């Protein structure tokens, strides 16, 4: 299935699941959508936190199509699930933004670690959340983001359990892709990130961590949602964690070496 065909399946309502493992060679994107009045500070926030918030594209006010991400792409309808935040609280999840869309909305598309999972799989590195048919586990850490204006919050990380040799190989592979979070930010000691229990992720689903495996943590594009919650904007929108926008950007094109 091509990315365009996948987006059509989302738009029609046929696909409403987490997007890990879909359209493997193509990049997926996190979304943050907010009024133009706050867009400059949010852009500075992303630039100040490039590990968690690597920008793939930024829209013009009111634009719901970003040609840099793909043809026949509609931000309002092509994500399986959206989070709606009002005054910093998650008030609803919706499957379309058509009724909520405003002419002053600015779209930020942020790289997603689902993008490099295809490369890991090609190297024989098994990914537990895909094996178990679950959403990837994500955790809010105790590490503060670099603040920009009203935006702060805490770093969010995704976790994949790997054996030692696979963890080393994963570092080597993902280091080539800083546009989709790059190398892990931590390996092995969740308490050092302020994570007390791997079995209770803040977002996504828990997965099995087997004896002899290390938890490997990558910066996560859900990080901006902690900033949106802390800023308490009257209205802001993001993807539901794990339910991403499929782009036409090839993962190979994002490699820096």
Swiss-Prot record:
The keyword Lyase applies. One of its GO terms (molecular function) is lyase activity. Keywords: Lyase. Disulfide bonds: none annotated. Pfam families: D-Glu_cyclase. It is an enzyme of class 4 (lyase). The keyword Acyltransferase does not apply. Belongs to the D-glutamate cyclase family. PANTHER family: D-GLUTAMATE CYCLASE, MITOCHONDRIAL. HAMAP family: Hydro_lyase (MF_01830). This is Putative hydro-lyase Bamb_5282. It comes from Burkholderia ambifaria (strain ATCC BAA-244 / DSM 16087 / CCUG 44356 / LMG 19182 / AMMD) (Burkholderia cepacia (strain AMMD)).
């Amino acid at each position: 299935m091509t990315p365009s065909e996948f987006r059509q399946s989302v738009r029609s309502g046929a696909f409403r699941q987490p997007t890990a493992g879909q359209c493997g060679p193509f990049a997926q994107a996190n979304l943050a959508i907010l009024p133009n009045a706050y867009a400059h500070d949010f852009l500075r926030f992303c630039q100040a936190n490039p590990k968690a918030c690597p920008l793939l594209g930024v829209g013009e006010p009111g634009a719901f199509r970003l040609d840099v991400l793909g043809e026949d792409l509609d931000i309002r309808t092509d994500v399986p699930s959206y989070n709606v935040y009002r005054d910093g609280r998650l008030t609803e999840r919706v499957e379309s933004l058509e009724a909520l869309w405003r002419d002053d909305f600015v779209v930020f598309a942020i790289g997603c670690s689902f993008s490099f999972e295809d490369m890991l799989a090609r190297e024989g590195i098994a990914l537990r959340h895909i094996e178990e048919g679950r959403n990837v586990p994500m955790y809010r850490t105790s590490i503060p983001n670099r603040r920009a204006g009203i935006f702060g919050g805490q770093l969010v990380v995704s976790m994949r359990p790997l054996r030692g040799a696979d963890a080393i190989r994963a570092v080597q592979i993902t280091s080539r892709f800083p546009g989709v979070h790059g190398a892990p930010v931590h390996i092995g000691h969740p308490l050092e990130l302020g994570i007390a229990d791997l079995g209770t992720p803040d977002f996504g689903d828990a997965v099995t961590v087997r004896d002899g495996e290390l938890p490997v943590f990558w910066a996560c594009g859900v990080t901006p949602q902690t900033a949106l919650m802390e800023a308490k904007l009257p209205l802001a929108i993001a993807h539901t964690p794990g339910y991403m926008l499929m782009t036409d950007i090839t993962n190979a094109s994002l490699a820096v070496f």
